[in-house]
Curated annotation (Swiss-Prot):
InterPro entries: MeTrfase_TrmA_AS, MeTrfase_TrmA_CS, SAM-dependent_MTases_sf, TrmA_MeTrfase, U5_MeTrfase_fam. One of its GO terms (molecular function) is tRNA binding. It comes from the Bacteria. It comes from Shewanella sediminis (strain HAW-EB3). PANTHER family: TRNA/TMRNA (URACIL-C(5))-METHYLTRANSFERASE (PTHR47790), TRNA_TMRNA (URACIL-C(5))-METHYLTRANSFERASE (PTHR47790:SF2). The lineage of its organism: Bacteria, Pseudomonadati, Pseudomonadota, Gammaproteobacteria, Alteromonadales. This is tRNA/tmRNA (uracil-C(5))-methyltransferase. The gene is trmA. S-adenosyl-L-methionine binds at residues 189, 217, 222, 238, 298. One of its GO terms (biological process) is tRNA methylation.
Amino acid sequence: MNLAAMDPNTYDAQLEEKRIKLEQIFTDFDTPKLEVFSSEPAHYRMRAEFRIWHDGEDMYYYMFDKALDSKVRCDQFLPASELINKVMPALMEELRPNPTLRHRLFQIDFLSTLSGEILVSLLYHKQLDAQWEIEAKALKEKLAATFNINIIGRARKQKLIIDKDFVIESLTVNNEQLQYHQIENSFTQPNGKVSVKMLEWAIDVTKNSQGDLLELYCGNGNFSIALAQNFDRVLATELAKPSVESAQYNIKINKIDNLQIIRMSAEDFTDAMAKKRTFRRLEGIDLDSYNCNTIFVDPPRAGMDPDTVKLVQGYDRIVYISCNPNTLIDNLAELSKTHKITRFALFDQFPYTDHMESGVFLERR
């Protein structure tokens, strides 16, 4: 991470560079005007990870700065949420003088929410015992006087939870509240306010939809829960078990009654739709009963494999969220043969970095 590049005074300029770069990448495609959704210039990351450096009696957070090729002390961290920045010194003040909690501590992870909850994970190169648990409970009790906080201790093949291993995020999307169960050590959108803009964009491009929605790679249901209002039914797939459990939880707390989550990979689901194989996980689910005219995909950085691209091409309307414009371009080379891009967006999830989150909405030619 290049810490020197994180200067709010340069935010607008770096976003403009991304806009120009993304438009250049898409030169070979007929795209509408690029919609650009900016981030807060500071305190935008809802999660952060720090290594811990021990220096005699002192102990502090640090990160490795690639530009300097060295570690940099981080008593505060500009990109992290204001809540993380408030908890960082308060936590360290309690850890430094506590031999049980500081011994062989090598990393601290923070997961915060816009709604004011924070989860702190303490990672150790030692096994955690009953004394550690006593001290950690006392630590939580002291910090809980100021913060809505929970603590996790992690070591090899060990996880101790005090008292929860998740947070509940509450997002205001088009003036409505959506709640999301976010579990420790699983994927969540890092930039909370930009995530809201992404949800609102996806709702907008799919308004006035007919029929049902299929979503691949649904994670904790982040998009499918928000989009359920636009469709008769939603069928979503996700492979990671913790994410599926969170998605089921989120369906309940948001009182969504038209969303079905299936735990399976996009590749396996592609085989199931093509009737190449049968899967026990699909027992009781009549895929043929769904009338999916729209498909939503948010694949990993590697993009979609050729078979999944072929599956996606079978739908009249495609919403594609991408964290890697290069693999998006690769997939669009095939998708654009049958579909045209009618909406095009840049979401600045990761300010001051080269990463670009983009979205395209395609309709059959």
